[in-house]
Regions:
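Hydrophobic ligand-binding cavity/cleft-lining segments
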Residues: 1-38
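Intrinsic-disorder/low-complexity, polar/charged segments enriched in Ser/Thr/Lys/Arg/Asp/Glu/Gln
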Residues: 2-8, 15, 39, 51, ...
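Short, surface-exposed charged micro-motifs
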Residues: 8, 43, 70, 98-100
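Hydrophobic pocket/interface hotspot
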Residues: 18, 28, 52, 71, ...
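Short amphipathic alpha-helical signal-transduction/dimerization elements
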Residues: 23, 134-142
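Glycine-rich portal/gate segments that line the openings of hydrophobic small-molecule binding cavities
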Residues: 40-83
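Beta-strand/loop substructures that line and gate deep hydrophobic ligand-binding cavities in soluble
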Residues: 81-131
Length: 147
C-alpha cells in the first residue's frame, strides 16, 4: 500500500512568485532538495503535457537518485499536478503531486498533496523532506529584492 502526505503553508508573497519557483529549473535546484542534498534539474518543460527530470545527491555519501514525470495540470499561479517516478526499480510506482496556490490577504496559501509514495519510503521521512524543502522555498520567495 502506498502513502500520502499533505502539507499546508502560507507564504507572504504572491501566488505567481511561488508558482514560478515550482517551474524554474534554477529555483527548483535551490529549494527542492531537503537539507544535506544537492539537486540537478536535467529536464524541465513546464507546461501541461511537458516532462521533468531531476536527481538528488546525498552530499555526505555522494549517492544519487533520479526521478521524473509529466505535468498533468498546469494553471499558472493556481494549480500544478504532476507525476514522479523513481529511476530505481526497487522503488516502483508512480506518485502524483498536486500543488494549489491561493491568494489570501497575507500572501499565498500553498496546499500540497503527494500520493502514491512507494512502500519502502517511510511517509514520515517524506513529510520531513517536504517540510525542509518548504522552509527553503520560503527563504527563496519571501524576500522582495529590488533590481
Amino acid at each position: 500500500m502506498s502513502g500520502t502526505v499533505k502539507l499546508h503553508r502560507v507564504l507572504p508573497t504572491s501566488p505567481e512568485k511561488v508558482f514560478r519557483a515550482f517551474t524554474d529549473a534554477a529555483a527548483m535546484a535551490q529549494w527542492l532538495p531537503p537539507y544535506g542534498f544537492t539537486a540537478t534539474v536535467h529536464e524541465l518543460d513546464a507546461r501541461e503535457g511537458g516532462r521533468h527530470r531531476a536527481s538528488f545527491t546525498n552530499f555526505t555519501t555522494g549517492n544519487s537518485h533520479a526521478f521524473g514525470g509529466e505535468y498533468l495540470e498546469f494553471s499558472p499561479g493556481k494549480r500544478l499536478r504532476y507525476t514522479d517516478r523513481f529511476d530505481d526499480p526497487d522503488m516502483p510506482g508512480e506518485m502524483v503531486v498536486t500543488v494549489e496556490f491561493e491568494a489570501v490577504p497575507m500572501g499565498t496559501e500553498l496546499r500540497i498533496e503527494q500520493a502514491g509514495i512507494p512502500d519502502m519510503i517511510p511517509v514520515s521521512a517524506c513529510y520531513l523532506g517536504w517540510q525542509e524543502s518548504l522552509d527553503k522555498l520560503s527563504k527563496l520567495v519571501t524576500p522582495e529584492i529590488p533590481d
